[in-house]
């Protein structure tokens, strides 16, 4: 081993990088020498994280697919790795089920990864990584999980 950090000189984009798994992944990538580019909806939190990690940041809702496309268009090429995390799942008993909230959840968990894959494909170098986080709710049964388990 040369002692060189594993991600030195690489660029890592984290969609949903201001908290949770996205933030911890960004911290690890930065610690391994990567340039980190973060997106998130919460502008204040994203700015704090951006300062902490010396990261490039872009505050917007990634389910705004037009804005997401512009984000990728404006990125320098090549990108080495893209991670997409999503908001938490939508749980509700059927009698209280909000169809509009469910639609937004489908958009964030199913359509967002497809859109990122399409938009990122023109920027990610050959051999690069597209990584999409999922959950385990589809394997569990309980009241209120019918939608997310589908």
Q: Where would I find each of the regions flagged by the language model?
A:
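Flexible N-terminal pre-Rossmann segment of NAD(P)-dependent oxidoreductases
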Residues: 1-14
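Amphipathic alpha-helical dimer-interface segment in Rossmann-like NAD(P)H-dependent oxidoreductases
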Residues: 77, 108-128
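N-terminal Rossmann NAD(P)H-binding glycine-rich loop of SDR-like oxidoreductase domains
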Residues: 18, 26
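Rossmann-fold cofactor-recognition segment
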Residues: 52-66
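Catalytic Tyr-X3-Lys loop
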Residues: 95-114
